[in-house]
């Protein structure tokens, strides 16, 4: 497990509809709750559902001058296309978490695969894959506290969606 750093540059990559932009916003909100500075950007492929979707998050204790990820520390790849795009960065020390449900398993240092989509589906809602994978990432790399993410989830959701997303967060954290 990495020690606590001052700055994290994170890329969340997958396909439109997987909730990665929301995950990036929520990660940023959790960092703000902890008194950190945050920049969050996103881009979409040709189709909002199905095309490559990217969310970038920079978390820093200092002021953030350049607002795009230049040297990612952590990448979440929820599709084969996303993993293909970034897999080579693992050799340069970038920690990559990927979904073995939708991407071919790979061996190598800094490559960590979990069946995020299958677990989310087993929980009863594949849409919770974003929060489940955030739980695993933040448990492995302490960029924000799990309690901060849970607080953001409590502010954004209610009723059954709240319960489901808190359970997805717990399941993700439990993978590590």
Residue ranges of each PLM-predicted region?
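Active-site cofactor/cluster-binding pocket
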Residues: 1-176
């Amino acid at each position: 497990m990495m020690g606590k750093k001052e700055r994290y540059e994170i890329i969340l990559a997958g396909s439109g509809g997987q909730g990665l932009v929301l995950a990036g916003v929520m990660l940023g909100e959790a960092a703000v709750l902890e008194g950190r500075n945050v920049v969050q950007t996103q881009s979409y492929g040709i189709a909002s559902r199905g095309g490559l979707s990217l969310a970038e998050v920079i978390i820093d204790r200092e002021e953030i001058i350049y607002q795009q990820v230049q040297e990612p520390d952590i990448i979440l790849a929820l599709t084969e296309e996303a993993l293909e795009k970034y897999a080579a960065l693992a050799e340069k020390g970038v920690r990559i978490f990927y979904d073995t449900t939708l991407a071919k398993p790979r061996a190598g240092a800094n490559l960590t695969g979990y069946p995020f989509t299958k677990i989310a589906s087993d929980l009863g809602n594949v849409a919770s894959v974003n929060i489940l994978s955030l739980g695993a990432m933040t448990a492995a790399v302490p960029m924000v506290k799990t309690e901060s993410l849970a607080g953001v989830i409590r502010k954004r959701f209610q009723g059954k969606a709240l319960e489901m997303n808190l359970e997805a967060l717990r399941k993700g954290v439990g993978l590590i």
